[in-house]
Regions:
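Polytopic transmembrane helical bundles with strong interfacial aromatic enrichment
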Residues: 1-124
Length: 124
């Protein structure tokens, strides 16, 4: 699990990196577009993933559901922000489906984290 923890931390850093890039692009290159929403998701989920890793380490969240929830947040964020960004930059129809799938994964990730916290409470 140690390598998964490191991978999730690295991916969270990438979410933050791309979130700042998209925020800058939204402000300077494409104001008034949904790039701001993509940036917001990335910039809020990046520290959330890091917080989840800390919560798993301290026992506030269970390991299995905690890591699974964090992974869902990472994948959901990439799909959501990637779908919005690709839709704005290309004429492909596939990206239109990525954002709703990513949003659904984000919702599922937060539900998994809720359950992880509940299960951790019951074990004490």
């Amino acid at each position: 699990m140690r390598s998964l923890e490191k991978l999730l931390a690295i991916l969270a850093a990438l979410l933050g990196f791309f979130g700042v890039m998209l925020a800058a692009a939204s402000a300077h290159l494409a104001p008034g577009t949904s790039l701001g929403s993509a940036a917001l998701i990335l910039l809020t989920q990046a520290p959330a993933v890091l917080a989840v890793l800390a919560a798993v380490r301290t026992g506030l969240f269970g390991r299995s559901f905690g890591f699974l929830g964090a992974l869902a947040l990472v994948i959901g964020s990439v799909l959501f922000a990637g779908g919005i960004t690709m839709r704005l930059l290309t004429s492909l129809s596939l990206p239109a489906m990525l954002a709703p799938i990513g949003g659904t994964l984000l919702i599922a990730g937060w539900l998994l984290l809720f359950l992880s916290g509940i299960f951790a409470l019951r074990r004490r």
